[in-house]
Amino acid sequence: MGSYLPSTSGEREQMLADLGFDSTDDLYAIVPEAARAGELDLPSGLTELELREKLGAMAAENTVFRSVFRGAGAYRRFVPALVKTVISKEEFVTAYTPYQAEVSQGVLQSIFEYQSMVCELTGMDVSNASLYDGATAAAEAVFMCQDRKRSGVVVSATVNPQTIETVKTYCESRGVEVEVIPAKGGATDAPAFAAALGEATACAIIQQPNYFGILEDAGDLIEAIHAAGAKAIMAADPVSLGILASPGELGVDICVAEGQSLGLPLSFGGPYLGIIACTSALMRKLPGRIVGQTQDAQGNRAFVLTLQAREQHIRREKASSNVCSNEALCALAAGTYLACMGPDGLARAASSSYAKAHYLAERLCEIDGFDLAWDAPFMNEFATTCPLDPAALERALAERGVLMGLPIEFVPDAASGGSGTSEAAAQGRPHGSPERGILWCATEMNSKAQIDEAVELVKEWAR
């Protein structure tokens, strides 16, 4: 154990002697007895074998699902072994962009490569070094769009409910009005959405694919946003961008995304990764760190933190954001994942997810009472009706090692006479979802055998 201790017993005795004390108790005698912690009731140490057994017993108490059919913003995807190998290197194991950053050229280059790949994936001009998660990235994007004349925010109800609540939380303290437009048929109600845009609207947020997996008519929505003089923010699924049109191609001003799908495990909800990228016109409003490429005094390529005048350590309370410490290690994982997969690998993952989700939907619709909630194109998530209690089905499948889709509740479409401000909506439940429905998901991790097994279990329960 000597190598794990800062000093030996002999060194401690020498230090006490130099200070004129005979023991450690004499050293702390000046501390009142009532303020001392006393003896700590800690168990005795364990051998490595005993520790392995104890941790193994604790881990065995976890519920581990053989197959997962739940997404709703967090996805079980394949992670190449190289990702964990790279982020486990001691040179990288920190969440910080280092102080005296230019000394750490390797860290800066890894962030620069991440930024470059994010820009290539999203079709945007500039990316930062990452944010905390997709929801906070959306909130930061809203603040990028604020000015003296425009501050209002319009959000489609088909955006992830957690993102909507995060945006509302960020905006509340600044007195920024957030208007959520109810869905129609599981997608954005385009006429209502366009009607909500006005001279005071700073930005509008849409999601592609949306929370229910449906592919929005994004081009028309973005055109309506720009026609009103507002900025368009798109929350994108990064893996789906392997086959879908990029936000840049669609004319988006700011793209945000949850980067968990890019090489990060589900891991009890975090840490995840906030991706944000924008057009060059908004570059100086980007929050957080940005790494740039330049030349040193000898003419060699070098990497630096650039445009730092935006940041809180320079501008203090006038900074565009208070983000400082970031998700650098998670960004490294995402960058490594993208480098491993390449454009072709990402496209295969997206195509496989699409095909398996549609196969799952086809099989589920064979069961009486299970129907697609909406007749609309979807990516790798979809909602179905459920004839009985979804919570009971969830428990039944969990006992067999299968995590089914997320139970969701019905909020009537605005067009059908329902209120967009019902109690269910106020509780953060998604608008326009089917009564007693289930939001299913499939990725490249779901085999045909797993899908068939899950469908048979649902059939067995539904009899």
Residue ranges, per PLM feature:
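Compact, charge-rich alpha-helical regulatory domains located at protein termini
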Residues: 1-39
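PLP-dependent enzyme catalytic core of the Aspartate aminotransferase-like
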Residues: 2, 11, 17, 116, ...
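N-terminal entrance/gating region of PLP-dependent enzymes' catalytic architecture
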Residues: 37-113
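Gly-rich Lys/Arg/Thr-decorated short loops/hinges at beta-loop-alpha junctions or inter-strand turns
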Residues: 89-101, 117-123, 149-150, 171-179, ...
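Short loop-beta-helix segment that forms the pyridoxal 5′-phosphate
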Residues: 99-103, 119-139
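Conserved PLP-enzyme active-site core in the AAT-like
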Residues: 136-300, 369, 384, 391-395, ...
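Terminal amphipathic helices with adjacent charged low-complexity linkers/tails
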Residues: 146-150, 173-183, 373-410, 434-438, ...
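Active-site C-terminal subdomain of aminotransferase-like
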Residues: 262-368, 372-375
